[in-house]
């Protein structure tokens, strides 16, 4: 599941942030990029549905990716306006925590077969995770 792949990435980031010793010479940046890509894949999957075998061309996949990034960027710009770019004062570890919280929400929604009580939709959670990962990378100087 894409949600589990995102969780693995976020959990590894959390471990890298907490542990001084690294046994694999890969940093947080690549994991944040992975979170962004898996979240976009999840948004595409929500739009098109789940399939057993790839059924879109590379060109169509790229168009869908760009479309979801553009929609997510617009959401980020609107939220930045409303929240006064509060993310700029946040630590990378706090952004990681927010990603993990969103993942818990997504898992709960998935476990309830898409039903939510008061929560936003699953797609909004993926969009927020993309934006938190981008904010973290900006903080890292990427």
Provide a role label for each language-model segment:
Residues 1-142:
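Intrinsically disordered, low-complexity regulatory regions
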């Amino acid at each position: 599941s894409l949600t589990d792949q995102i969780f693995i990435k976020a959990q590894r980031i959390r471990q890298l942030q907490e542990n001084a010793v690294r046994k694999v010479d890969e940093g947080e940046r690549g994991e944040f990029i992975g979170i962004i890509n898996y979240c976009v894949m999840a948004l595409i999957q929500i739009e098109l549905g789940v399939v057993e075998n790839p059924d879109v061309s590379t060109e169509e996949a790229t168009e869908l990716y760009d479309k979801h990034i553009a929609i997510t960027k617009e959401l980020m710009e609107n939220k930045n306006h409303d929240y006064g770019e509060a993310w700029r004062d946040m630590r990378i570890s706090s952004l990681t925590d927010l990603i993990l919280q969103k993942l818990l929400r997504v898992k709960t929604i998935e476990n309830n077969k898409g039903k939510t009580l008061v929560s936003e939709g699953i797609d909004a959670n993926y969009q927020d995770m993309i934006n938190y990962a981008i904010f973290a990378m900006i903080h890292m100087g990427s």
